[in-house]
Amino acid sequence: MFYFSLHINYCKYLPRFQSLAVNLQSILYNAQIMSLTSIASKFFLPRQHELERYFTQPEELQKEVLHYLVSKGCNTEYGRNHLFSSMDSYDDFAQNVPVNTYEELKDDIDRMRHGETNVLWPGQVKWYAKSSGTTNDKSKFIPVSPEGLQNIHYQGGKDVVALYLRNNPQSRLFDGRSLILGGSHSPNYNVQDSIVGDLSAILIENINPLVNLIRVPKKRTALLSDFELKRDRIAHECLHKNVTNISGVPSWMMSVLVRVLEISGKKHLEDVWPNLEVFFHGGIAFTPYRKQYEQLITSPKMHYMETYNASEGFFGIQDDPDDSSMLLMLDYGVFYEFIPVEEVGTPHPTIVPLEGVEIGRNYAMVITTSCGLWRYEIGDTVRFTSKKPYKFVITGRTKYFINAFGEELIMDNAEKGLAYACEKTGAQVSEYTAAPVYMDANAKCRHQWLIEFSKDPDSVEHFRDLLDQQLQTVNSDYEAKRFHDVTLQKLEVVVAQKGLFNEWLKRKGKLGGQHKIPRLSNSRKNIDELLEMNKEKLV
């Protein structure tokens, strides 16, 4: 009876079924032509329009963010102690809330980790990002609230895609897989009421399950703590996938990609993943690695897009492929303030909100976020290149510098000097660190650079001379101290064995994840350890 009834109904509605079939065929055909990316791109259009306010109303956006943060903070112990309920303006906020380092918030964060609620942010915060820091820093545990997770970190990821698709309308980004290279959890730091891990591990753990359909590697592989094992498994798992985009820290991603080529026997990555089109990178400067990536990926359609994301938040995105500066993200639940670098550490530094910054000046960044960080010194330094919209470049870290003799050498100077020397000599630098030699047996002072080359210069001496010359060009204080070799002698370059820096990190249990090499330091502790290891035969 059922089949008979079905047949009668089929005959009765045959014209409609035929019409529906034609429509379905048309939809499927158009979907094949349009690609999944073309369809998905439409979901990003509203946000692309919202981002126009960054050009027209940037200061207003920041006022809205501050109002939101203070109103939420009223319901916390910190807010009550600092009179949040009586605040009506930025001046009230600046007057009542002190600038904080991690050490000044640590006791409150420790209480939150043990389950106390409404301390720095309303409710209970379960997740904590273990800050990578340097190899000799004590760990920091940065709270990641549900609001911060969604409205800062995940929103940053969405906006990266929105801006990329805006700039590349022919993209096929969603027609393949995303290779996302992350860190791991840190169970040894867990307490009963909280979970600790690298930020990237927290993001993978909490990501929308639908994203896992287009993400590689498998979750259990992505969260492995043994980087060498993780690298090998990622390479094998992703080898035969249609990878269209990769995301991660340039140094660690390079290690994975080299392994992929070793296993595949191919020379270039486009021979493995012909549809690879973009690398979303952040965490460290990309300049020292660009040439290496261009050698591994020779496809003219390959794009590179920088992001500024950290355990504390997601702050910037490169919105123009022809401009290396990044757009400051203004509506994420992050309120920004800035301290002129030369005033960092002074008793009463000048602190300005966004509208008070000057183009070309170096600032240390202070953030207030929906994760409960109130006027928090993040330790990064930036320089604005534009105010319409607000765009900037990262110039270094407040603790990564050499100023042993008044030369005030920062990471931005170092990166420019290395890029110039590499360009002129054809060399490629994979890792480096530098520190002062305060006085040798001949009473001479200089900077000592330990450099691991992925491609050696023809002459290390020529490379050294070019680096020294360029540092004088970009830093007048260094130039003055180098004048006639009176204060500073010409810098020294020591060539590191291949793999030295990774072996150093490995011995400290910090290989992979978000761990970084400290580039510049007034202290010789790191470089002396590395120089001693450099005497060993590592391979």
Question: For each predicted feature, which ranges?
Answer:
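Active-site glycine/GP-rich loop and adjacent strand/helix microenvironment
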Residues: 3, 31-85, 92-100, 108-111, ...
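Conserved helicase ATPase motor motifs in RecA-like P-loop NTPase domains
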Residues: 129-135
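Active-site diphosphate/adenylate-binding microenvironment
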Residues: 60, 64-128, 139-144, 151, ...
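Conserved AMP-binding loop of ANL adenylate-forming enzymes
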Residues: 163-209
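Short, Lys/Arg-enriched N-terminal segments with co-localized hydrophobic residues
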Residues: 19-33
